[in-house]
Amino acid sequence: EKGFGFISPADGSKDVFVHFSAIQSTSFKTLDEGQRVEFTIEQGQK
């Protein structure tokens, strides 16, 4: 809805910011609350 959100790592570490443009999907670029995902942390401009 906002175009961004946060992912909570399974290891309990700090939440990670995610922008919709970073979502790699063959369909809609959305994530649902509670959905399990795999991710790689990369440094952005901020």
Swiss-Prot record:
Induction: In response to low temperature. It is found in: Cytoplasm. GO terms for cellular component: cytosol. Residues 1-46 form the CSD domain. One of its GO terms (molecular function) is DNA binding. InterPro entries: Cold_shock_CspA, CSD, CSD_CS, CSP_DNA-bd, NA-bd_OB-fold. Signal peptide: none annotated. Keywords: Activator, Cytoplasm, DNA-binding, Stress response, Transcription, Transcription regulation. Homodimer. This is Major cold-shock protein.
